[in-house]
Amino acid sequence: MSYISAVDRKEQLINATIAVLQKSGIEGVTTRSVAAEAKAPLASIHYTFGSLDDLVLAAVERLIEEVNAWVADGLDVKAGYGPCIIGIMERVAGLLEDERYGVLLRDLNPTGDRRVEKLEEKYYRLAQDIMDSIAVAVGHEPAIPRPQLARMTMAAIDGVVLQFAANNDIKIARSDLAQFGLVLADAAERRL
């Protein structure tokens, strides 16, 4: 067996974990399944990450970073809160059908899994960062305080994703995300 640097082994194991997540969901991620997918020795997981939980966290963090970049890239924050919220909902709807990211949204929603709960703040930070960017770009606050608007946006997404995980009906999920987008956009832009 040829030598693989620690950096390369780390990438190999993260990619293998993501592949196992896609194939088998969180329940299918075991030390053996990841090692087999990576074609790496079992001990390499503990040597590189310390534990399977640490490896799963690293893999999910990678997916969250990719989702954050994909959702935020190309949003025209100068257009205002409404168009951006609608854009977020449209992008999330597209992610539900994506093999790489669908697992993150469907299978790794916070459900009491300690590994996932540690990542919840990163997940919610995306909406807050976008709301902050919009505020800077448009020079005014939304009608709903930014932290609350970010939480409401993510709560809508979480609810639709949980329903999608239960019924697997993409048409309903897309429609519900679109409607939540319109409602939140209207509420954010409304001036009292």
Feature names for model-found ranges:
Residues 49, 94, 107-114:
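Short helix-capping/turn signature of helix-turn-helix
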Residues 12, 16-24, 70-73, 108, ...:
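Solvent-exposed, amphipathic alpha-helical segments
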Residues 98, 111, 133, 154-172, ...:
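Amphipathic C-terminal alpha-helical segment
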Residues 68, 73, 98-101, 114-138, ...:
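Amphipathic alpha-helical packing segments from all-alpha helical-bundle domains
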